From Swiss-Prot:
Its EC number is 3.2.1.15. This is Endo-polygalacturonase. The lineage of its organism: Bacteria, Pseudomonadati, Pseudomonadota, Gammaproteobacteria, Enterobacterales. GO terms for biological process: carbohydrate metabolic process; cell wall organization. InterPro entries: GH28_Enzymes, Glyco_hydro_28, Pectin_lyas_fold, Pectin_lyase_fold/virulence. It is an enzyme of class 3 (hydrolase).
């Protein structure tokens, strides 16, 4: 053991023993099983025209409990502007069929000239697919939804991703559309569908109760900024299972905001993560409870299992369990960081009952456990955590139990 720059740095390897049932650790209060694809109310055939009004009309006229089916016609691509899912109605995309967002910023603006620009706000675009106050709606594959994030916009000289990169340089915010935005909804399902090239976050489930992503594939280049995979925000009863997620930002980011509902009862089970920023909680952590991450494989993420926040957004995080996790080519396998960004604020993180069990990193990495408050250290339990012998641990204001 040695000390560097006021921090304790450890190099150690702890043996792994045994596995345990994922079902015993599931946190979603619902009984969740593999979804069943609903029957269709109508079938639309793709052609060369822009299909926004045709798809929206079919969705509006569809009976609850059924889906609008998108099938190949003279082409396999439906080109569309923003769509809204009604309550109880789903979208079904056939194998080999792609629902593709138009590459025109004006189509997504929610105020005159608000989308496709950089400013201090970053809220000028509608999502490609929106569901508000729905119950039992969903999106089903095995087809694909393509946000065209890397394609130059017809009414701009840049792509959505180039706009995001420009905003970073200018220290501003990009106005780019999310792929799927679900607000104040119950029991929303993503099943067996592929999501690619989102201009911004791929899926956001906000202020809702009941969300399932099962056999969902998300694939966007690692260089595409702010392209989170799935973000549950101020919501409860979430299951993400048997899915593959590779993005340019957090693969999954669980968030809880001030003045809104707590985020609780989250199950992340049997998933594979490729490139991205990892399995994250935060940076908004104002009430996150009862999270289970079990049977997760990660290869090539910058971070592995991460809880992040700062003085502006920290709060209570309690009851987080990571188990049966295998990582490879992950620079920082475990990160618990209360000073993720140097923002102003008076919030004190209260993080406790965080358990890592049967967690392996097969390649060299750095574990960062960084507490902000010596009087209220973070409580972490580690059992059977295995790192390579040349990995290092950085610990400050954190109580580690074995």
């Amino acid at each position: 053991m040695e000390y560097q720059s006021g921090k304790r740095v450890l190099s150690l390897s702890l043996g792994l023993i045994g596995l345990f049932s994922a079902s015993a650790w599931a946190s979603d209060s619902r009984t969740v099983s593999e979804p069943k694809t609903p029957s269709s109310c109508t079938t639309l055939k793709a052609d060369s025209s822009t299909a926004t009004s045709t798809i929206q009309k079919a969705l509006n006229n569809c009976d609850q409990g059924k889906a609008v089916r998108l099938s190949a016609g003279s082409t396999s691509v439906f080109l569309s502007g923003p769509l809204s899912l009604p309550s109880g109605v789903s979208l079904l995309i056939d194998k080999g069929v792609t629902l593709r967002a138009v590459n025109n910023a004006k189509s997504f603006e929610n105020a005159p000239s608000s989308c496709g620009v950089v400013d201090k706000n970053g809220k000028g675009c509608d999502a490609f697919i929106t569901a508000v106050s729905t119950t039992n709606s969903g999106i089903y594959g095995p087809g694909t939804i393509d946000g065209q994030g890397g394609v130059k916009l017809q009414d701009k000289k840049v792509s959505w991703w180039e706009l995001a990169a420009d905003a970073k340089v200018k220290k501003l915010k990009q106005n780019t559309p999310r792929l799927i935005q679900i607000n104040k909804s119950k029991n929303f399902t993503l099943y067996n569908v592929s999501l690619i090239n989102s201009p911004n976050f791929h899926v956001v489930f906000s202020d809702g109760d009941g969300f399932t992503a099962w056999k969902t594939t998300i694939k966007t280049p690692s260089t595409a900024r702010n392209t989170d995979g799935i973000d549950p925000m101020s919501s409860k009863n979430i299951t993400i299972a048997y899915s593959n997620i590779a993005t340019g930002d957090d693969n999954v980011a669980i968030k809880a905001y001030k003045g809104r509902a707590e985020t609780r009862n989250i199950s992340i089970l049997h998933n594979d993560f490729g490139t991205g920023h990892g399995m994250s909680i935060g940076s908004e952590t104002m009430g996150v409870y009862n999270v289970t991450v079990d049977d997760l494989k990660m290869n090539g993420t910058t971070n592995g299992l991460r809880i992040k926040s700062d003085k502006s957004a920290a709060g209570v995080v309690n009851g987080v369990r990571y188990s049966n996790v295998v990582m490879k080519n992950v620079a920082k396998p475990i990160v618990i960081d209360t000073v993720y960004e140097k923002k102003e604020g008076s919030n004190v993180p209260d993080w406790s009952d965080i358990t890592f069990k049967d967690v392996t990193s097969e390649t060299k990495g750095v574990v960062v456990l960084n507490g902000e408050n010596a009087k209220k250290p973070i409580e972490v339990t580690m059992k059977n955590v295995k790192l390579t012998s040349d990995s290092t641990w950085q610990i400050k204001n954190v109580n580690v139990k074995k």
